[in-house]
Every structure is written in structure tokens, then in C-alpha cells.
Amino acid sequence: MPKMKNNKGAAKRFKKTAGGIKYKHATKRHILTKRTTKNKRQLRPNSLLPRCEVAAVARMLPYA
């Protein structure tokens, strides 16, 4: 049986930790002048994936 492959896009975006699956918020790369300071601050911390989406991401990352 061939090896299963990780979804490369998901592998770059998600990291499996003991507490769950961690990800970074979107819209935080460039052209941030139109965003308020409050909005940029709220996007700063990494978040844990909601429980309803964990199974889908786990299927994309079989070796994580």
C-alpha cells in the first residue's frame, strides 16, 4: 500500500499541538494601513481550531 500524503497547503497552515490544532489568523500579511490598531491586535495571537473543523484538518494531515 502506498504512503499517505499530507495536504501541503494544510501542512503549511496548521500545526498539531497537545491542546489542539493551532493556526494563524488571515489578513495579517500586507496592506495593514487600512486596518485599525484594535483589529490588528485582535488578529495577533494564534488560535486553536474549532472542534467542528478538527476532523477535516486531521484527515488532511495523516502524519501530524
Swiss-Prot record:
PROSITE patterns in the record: RIBOSOMAL_L35 (PS00936)
Keyword annotations: Ribonucleoprotein, Ribosomal protein
Gene encoding the protein: rpmI
Species this protein is from: Vibrio vulnificus (strain YJ016)
Keyword Ribosomal protein: yes
Superkingdom of origin organism: Bacteria
GO cellular component: cytosolic large ribosomal subunit
Family: Belongs to the bacterial ribosomal protein bL35 family.
GO molecular function, one term: structural constituent of ribosome
HAMAP family attached to this UniProt entry: Ribosomal_bL35
Record's protein name: Large ribosomal subunit protein bL35
GO BP annotations listed: translation
